[in-house]
Amino acid sequence: MSIVRMTDLALSGKRVLIRQDLNVPIDQGRITSEQRIIASLPTIRVALERGAAVMVTSHLGRPKEGVWSEEDSLAPVAKRLSQLLGIEVPLRRDWVDGVQVAPGQLVLLENCRMNVGEAENDEALARKYAALCDVFVMDAFGTAHRAQASTHGVICCAAIAAGGPLLMAELDALSRGLEHPVKPLLAIVGGSKVSTKLELLSNLVNNVEQLITGGGIANTFLAAAGYSIGKSLYEGDLIETAREIITAAKARGAEIPLPTDVVVAKQFLPGVTATVKTVDAIVADDLILDIGPQTARHYAALIETAATVVWNGPVGVFEFDAFSKGTEVLARAVAASSAFSIAGGGDTLAAIDKYGVADQISYISTGGGAFLEFLEGKTLPAVAALQARSG
């Protein structure tokens, strides 16, 4: 991917503005998950070690533009960065018109979404951001799908614009998994609705050899194949779309394997009785809440034969133990596989954490919406802007 990399630049004495994704959950001033802060540290350390005057900004929450809000302030992030880096990290509240920072120093610039014009990618604001630095570094993959002043406009205006190590690692992994995958490529797509992942399914079916579905998505595909699904979650208005996706897969020799057995209950509640049934034995008041053991074994065998695996979404209601076995079997199969594996999406990350397999997945994307849009085959605005500047 043709993008100027921060690690290839001479940064000594340069003013470097880094856009990170430090949008961490905060409860009563306490950071409850510092994963994104930890992920940002290598980029910051490289810039400091190379003698740059480093400025970092990020969004946090959804503040009203032009209004400072303590609830959405990066103050807790500045404090935690100071502790992790072992240096003072001052927080600058009013920074758009200029920042004092010396080589070897780091300042955190207050929540960029508080700046008027940020969300609509205002050119005047983007130019002010660009004027702050000699080098702008985009390192926030999680916001690369948003064309905003700090993620897109400034890339177009800055003297030099580069991709940071975190962003480039994400793009390199996604490119390896989707744009230039070693075949066979298998994708797992779970979730409640076909409608939210329709573009994803339509794009993947043109690239994969196997497309495993789970959750409400699988129920819609079962209904499209003529099976009764009782009162299970599905989308009746997308049955024809599901049939078209199945037809498209068959036309290029790909397969969308359907469950042969499922785990059902009469109510969607923890502690209810779970029953394994074949898919042709579903009755009117059944709720399908997981794939069955026979299906899980079959899917695990398919994963074992894949050279590349892309995973987005669980295949059952894994939050309830009675309906978690399918997702667990697949998670462990992906972990045990010799394939290059990429996983992303909030529920997927929660499943990976639950089963303790994070260190056995080749790459775990923290990108959320950006990860999904990349899987859909969309061009991410920040990435497109960086590519345009590389020429």
UniProtKB/Swiss-Prot annotation:
ATP binds at K197, E319, G345, G346, D347, T348. GO terms for cellular component: cytosol. Gene3D superfamilies: Phosphoglycerate kinase, N-terminal domain. Its main location: cytoplasm. It is found in: Cytoplasm. Pathway: Carbohydrate degradation; glycolysis; pyruvate from D-glyceraldehyde 3-phosphate: step 2/5. The keyword Nucleotide-binding applies. Disulfide bonds: none annotated. It comes from the Bacteria. One of its GO terms (biological process) is glycolytic process. Belongs to the phosphoglycerate kinase family. This is Phosphoglycerate kinase.
